[in-house]
């Protein structure tokens, strides 16, 4: 089991390290806001560009495709670069993609620009978390990772509603321009606060690829792709569930999204705390909790006062993120950059798999709440992969 090599930054004061973590988290906030903002602006984009809302859905898919393609590709291409330089280049690419999206004249260029904006997503998070972990002692590495991921969860709670409000009252183009400005702010903060590390351990593209012949890496990625799908299965259909099952007005939907974001913040912190104490066993506890939450959700959906706590609990399932991310750093000796970036590609597979499975069931005539049962099945699938990973780990130690 390996850990990121201690960096020169470990000699920095706690205050300096906190500023670096805040700079890295700001990048996560920019990415999270850019990824989720369009979901609340689909009608605005459709009306402005003269296309249907399902066509705007393809814009979301283009971004996700960019993440899946860019995470491993850019991690490999940047393997020999200093991490500080790579972070700056990745965030510059993200800023460019969002400014271009804001200026897209028609639908087709917007598809291309969202794909470009998605390319640096996974690689940025992967490298940022390696930097954060390298500054922390072994028993606090998952907590450091969760601080970087906190930017993403705060984006769900604050950034997404802010961008949606800006897009509705001015133009959806201003929402993407705002994301670009936040990305430029991240570039400035990383350039100022993150020092160059001449002793940083470098990897090679061939070394990164060669390390991917180990089963623990693929099992960890599988746990993310399958185990996380349940959260996305339910969350993607939250609005129609509230309207048609809970039978509340559309004004409650932003409140529900904020409750979900609050759950994400709690879950993100809890995931890092658990993994620092339980290591791989934390993944099993999180997946078991996820299964329980998803099984309860269909029963909680019929009342506003029961579905809101259920939505909060759904958000806490994001605890799987920092736990799996840190586990990958442990098992991916020689391929930590590629593995950390690929973890976000796996999460985007979950983001596609969950809604697709839920959509199949709903299109077949089942109730909106069936998403909870389907999600529970995927969480159980993640537990099966955990059992396999646990067996492999015990056999090699």
Predicted region positions:
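Helix-breaking motifs and short loop linkers at transmembrane-helix boundaries and internal kinks
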Residues: 50, 82, 103-109, 247, ...
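Helix-to-loop junctions at the C-terminal end of transmembrane segments
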Residues: 71-82, 267-279, 362-363
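A late C-terminal transmembrane helix in Major Facilitator Superfamily
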Residues: 331-367, 374-375
